[in-house]
Amino acid sequence: MAVAVRTLQEQLEKAKESLKNVDENIRKLTGRDPNDVRPIQARLLALSGPGGGRGRGSLLLRRGFSDSGGGPPAKQRDLEGAVSRLGGERRTRRESRQESDPEDDDVKKPALQSSVVATSKERTRRDLIQDQNMDEKGKQRNRRIFGLLMGTLQKFKQESTVATERQKRRQEIEQKLEVQAEEERKQVENERRELFEERRAKQTELRLLEQKVELAQLQEEWNEHNAKIIKYIRTKTKPHLFYIPGRMCPATQKLIEESQRKMNALFEGRRIEFAEQINKMEARPRRQSMKEKEHQVVRNEEQKAEQEEGKVAQREEELEETGNQHNDVEIEEAGEEEEKEIAIVHSDAEKEQEEEEQKQEMEVKMEEETEVRESEKQQDSQPEEVMDVLEMVENVKHVIADQEVMETNRVESVEPSENEASKELEPEMEFEIEPDKECKTLSPGKENVSALDMEKESEEKEEKESEPQPEPVAQPQPQSQPQLQLQSQSQPVLQSQPPSQPEDLSLAVLQPTPQVTQEQGHLLPERKDFPVESVKLTEVPVEPVLTVHPESKSKTKTRSRSRGRARNKTSKSRSRSSSSSSSSSSSTSSSSGSSSSSGSSSSRSSSSSSSSTSGSSSRDSSSSTSSSSESRSRSRGRGHNRDRKHRRSVDRKRRDTSGLERSHKSSKGGSSRDTKGSKDKNSRSDRKRSISESSRSGKRSSRSERDRKSDRKDKRR
């Protein structure tokens, strides 16, 4: 350890000597010793200035500026006092009065006109010409003056050119000197910086060496102390005590050995820590030296960059002196650069176009997805609409069932009565029943097994009835009125249908056959003006719930025929009752009156007879009423056997009456009387019912008549 302390002391001495050398170099550069500390008072005096502080010095400076005339003039004080000022004012007043006196005298004195008049001298043209023409002496004088001026100007020009050349040379020399001075200054700064950095590094080394020396000395002292302690036994308890027995025994010998082992272990650990600490202290200056090296590298790079900048400046000067020799090359390079820029711009434009196309494709895809979603939503919503339609259909079916029960009672009651009041009220009841029937035509039909059975029966009836039936005969004028009334009634019924029907339904409103219209032409020319209207119900397209079967045509045929025959019975029975009360001469008038009172029944019978003969026309008109035929056939299903007997008898009687009606109108009365006998027995039981129901429907009939009249007026308009 003593050797280590000596080596450290030697290193410390060497470092001190090198530091002294650095201080001397700094003194040479700066002219002062870096170890000398400046006095604090001198700094304060230099900073504060002659005033000794901020405020005083600034005031003195301000006063100095104002006195020198650079700033605003200071206020001048009058030293003479107030008396001198007053005396001066009096003097100025006296002087102003003296000056104003002679002016007042001039104003008072009268002005006199001068007797001397200046003669006007007019120069002639010759005099002017002579003045312009110069003598030879004047010309020579002018030439000399002009020559002198030109000579002076040329001299000035020459001197100016020489001066410019000299100035250029001076400027070049000054620039070179400035560059050299800057380089020298930079070198001096770099040297100074390096010297100060060396000085700092040496100082750090000295400090480290001093610390090492101190630590080494402490370690030596501690080792000496440990060498003394190791001979004693150390207690296990703290604080540790060292003792030695007077007489040694094996137990004490063991304790000494154990304590020595422990102490040696402590000493070794302490030495290791000391060595590590010294290594750390040596590593610190190494790190500092690495930082210094990095700084030196950065400085060298800066110097190289500065030198390159100086070379570039020299090259630029050489290019300026030699001229623009490389302009062509530069122009070509500029053109190539422009072409490159244009190509870059084109590529950028193409990229932008591609991006726009991609955006458009993405938008199209998004729109398609939205459309698909909307269609799925609509498909989901369609089943809900179908369920609503089915619910409406079920409600309509319940209503139709109730109406069928009412109609069966009404159909049984609609037969002739002996009283004239019943004759007038029965057609009104039929008109009230008719809109309900038309409403049923628009409602959806029921597809059941019973409906199919009824269709088969109706087809068999058609085959039996189509063979013996003759051509229909047109009835007189009163038939046209109920047809028009039915048209007027059917239009509001069709318009008030609910939106449950999915398809467009074209409804022909009781179109008469061409034969009937031809025969009515000479009887009612006024009625031709009213056109037969067909009403269409257009609704939102929904999946069809109801389907119209071709078999419905046959159903409507049978229904219309059965209705016409039942009403022929009533009309004939009524005509016979009226003819029995009146004389044979007035039978034609009474029959016409009865037919006019029962307008609805006669019109319906004519329409039914015309539909039976004209097959295609009746099928077209009855295609719209397919759904109601099934309900009618059910309501009439109870009295099929009775209806067959009546229909056969009615057909035979029609054959007999058709020939008579063509020959003369009065023959209808006789035919109706003959047919009455067979029907009276069957119709007597039903007359009582019709009377009671007709009395109930009296109020309704009056309202229906008003509605009919209003509809007629609207159509005529």
Swiss-Prot record:
Residues 87-100, 120-139, 279-316, 341-350, 359-379, 394-413, 453-467, 653-664, 671-691, 702-717 have a biased composition (Basic and acidic residues). The modification Phosphothreonine is found at T124. Residues 2-32, 163-234, 287-379, 446-467 form a coiled coil. Residues 46-139, 279-717 are annotated as: Disordered. Expressed in placenta, lung, liver, kidney, pancreas, spleen, thymus, prostate, testis, ovary, small intestine, colon, heart, epidermis, esophagus, brain and smooth and skeletal muscle. Expressed strongly in melanoma metastasis lesions and advanced primary tumors. GO terms for molecular function: DNA binding; RNA binding; structural molecule activity. The modification Omega-N-methylarginine is found at R54. GO terms for cellular component: catalytic step 2 spliceosome; cell-cell junction; desmosome; intermediate filament; membrane; nuclear speck; nucleoplasm; plasma membrane. Residues 2-167 are annotated as: Necessary for mediating alternative 5' splicing. There is a cross-link at K157 (Glycyl lysine isopeptide (Lys-Gly) (interchain with G-Cter in SUMO1)). Keywords: Acetylation, Activator, Cell junction, Coiled coil, DNA-binding, Isopeptide bond, Methylation, mRNA processing, mRNA splicing, Nucleus, Phosphoprotein, Spliceosome, Transcription, Transcription regulation, Tumor suppressor, Ubl conjugation. It comes from the Eukaryota. Residues 2-284 are annotated as: Necessary for interaction with RNPS1. There is a cross-link at K109, K121, K137, K155, K157, K228, K280, K304, K311, K359, K365, K528, K536, K553 (Glycyl lysine isopeptide (Lys-Gly) (interchain with G-Cter in SUMO2)). One of its GO terms (biological process) is mRNA splicing, via spliceosome. The modification Phosphoserine is found at residues 48, 58, 66, 96, 100, 114-115, 347, 375, 381, 443, 450, 552, 658, 692, 695. Transcriptional activator binding to the E-box 1 core sequence of the E-cadherin promoter gene; the core-binding sequence is 5'CAGGTG-3'. Capable of reversing CTBP1-mediated transcription repression. Auxiliary component of the splicing-dependent multiprotein exon junction complex (EJC) deposited at splice junction on mRNAs. The EJC is a dynamic structure consisting of core proteins and several peripheral nuclear and cytoplasmic associated factors that join the complex only transiently either during EJC assembly or during subsequent mRNA metabolism. Found in a mRNA splicing-dependent exon junction complex (EJC). Found in a complex with SR proteins. Found in a mRNP complex with RNPS1. Component of the PSAP complex consisting of RNPS1, SAP18 and PNN. Interacts with PNISR, CTBP1, CTBP2, KRT8, KRT18, KRT19, PS1D/PNO40, PPIG, RNPS1, SFRS4 and SRRM2. Identified in the spliceosome C complex. This is Pinin. It comes from Homo sapiens (Human). The gene is PNN.
